[in-house]
């Protein structure tokens, strides 16, 4: 019993000492951008990974009448001098309606030429990251980053014509690691540019990705340590997922380009 009390006392002292050395972040950033882009690609969804339960590399976004999409992106970060932690979210949700120009099988449901199909898609990414600033001079900063990324997918469709289908859905999540970084250059006190590039480390079902953007920020308001900045820029996004089912795989490949980005940033 005495040994347990001694160990508990030592543990309590260690925790107290660690907590005493902790400090609150010295700065925070909240950034919201809304993205407008043109998407291409396909979503191949079998049933149970079995042969002949999906058309290969179909349906394409083009035949689903999905071309131009828009979606939100959020960044919330905290920094202790050069070290930072953050959460980033990209919620790419879009839909389309079309009349099929040829037969289609998807999720083991047979649709015929002339059938009407409406579909909803979700490609959402939730990224939890660490960063470290290397300030090369008063204007230029390089920031390598590493993230644990959770991919949230949903594919839902309905159809009328040769058969009636109501809200058939396939959804799942997948986790992976992303690496990359950003380069920031301050031209003046009020205007700067940020180049941001991230990619998934290929693992399991996530085969490849590239998320790149070049954005400018212009200061709208500054008081003490508080800033409000306007954000505008351009980007590119690609993502390839193919699971490990033996016969037929859930297989999604998409590119969004160019992406036009508009937003606002709060620093305090």
Residue locations for each model-derived region?
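Transmembrane beta-strands of outer-membrane beta-barrel proteins
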Residues: 26-32, 74, 83-87, 128, ...
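Transmembrane beta-strands of outer-membrane beta-barrel pores
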Residues: 34-40, 80-82, 89-95, 134, ...
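Outer-membrane beta-barrel "beta-signal"
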Residues: 220, 255-268
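Outer-membrane beta-barrel biogenesis signature
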Residues: 19-35, 41, 224-227
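Extracellular/periplasm-exposed beta-strand and loop segments of Gram-negative cell-envelope proteins
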Residues: 39-70, 91-125, 151-173, 201-205, ...
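Solvent-exposed loop/turn segments connecting transmembrane beta-strands
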Residues: 138, 200-211
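Outer-membrane beta-barrel channels and translocator barrels
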Residues: 25, 80-83, 135-139, 186-190, ...
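Cleavable N-terminal export/targeting peptides
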Residues: 1-29
């Amino acid at each position: 019993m005495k040994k347990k009390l001694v160990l508990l006392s030592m543990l309590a002292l260690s925790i107290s000492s660690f907590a005493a050395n902790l400090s609150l972040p010295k700065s925070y950033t909240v950034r919201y951008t809304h993205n407008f882009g043109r998407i291409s690609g396909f979503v191949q969804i079998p049933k149970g990974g079995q042969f002949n339960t999906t058309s290969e590399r179909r349906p394409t976004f083009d035949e689903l009448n999905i071309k131009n999409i828009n979606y939100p992106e959020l960044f919330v970060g905290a920094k202790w001098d050069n070290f930072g932690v953050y959460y980033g979210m990209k919620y790419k949700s879009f839909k389309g309606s079309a009349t099929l120009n040829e037969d289609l099988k998807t999720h083991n449901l047979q649709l015929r030429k002339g059938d009407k199909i409406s579909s909803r898609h979700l490609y959402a990414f939730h990224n939890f990251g660490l960063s470290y600033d290397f300030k090369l001079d008063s204007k230029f900063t390089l920031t390598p980053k590493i993230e644990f990324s959770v991919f949230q997918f949903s594919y839902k469709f309905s159809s009328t014509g040769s058969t009636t289908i109501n809200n058939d859905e396939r959804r799942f999540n997948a986790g992976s690691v992303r690496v990359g970084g950003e380069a920031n250059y301050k031209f003046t006190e009020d205007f700067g540019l940020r180049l941001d590039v991230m990619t998934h480390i290929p693992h399991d079902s996530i085969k490849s990705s590239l998320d790149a953007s070049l954005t400018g920020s212009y200061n709208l308001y500054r008081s003490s340590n508080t800033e409000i900045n306007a954000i505008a820029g351009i980007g590119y996004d690609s993502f390839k997922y193919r699971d490990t089912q033996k016969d037929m795989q859930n297989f999604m490949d998409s590119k969004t380009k160019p992406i036009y980005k508009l937003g606002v940033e709060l620093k305090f």
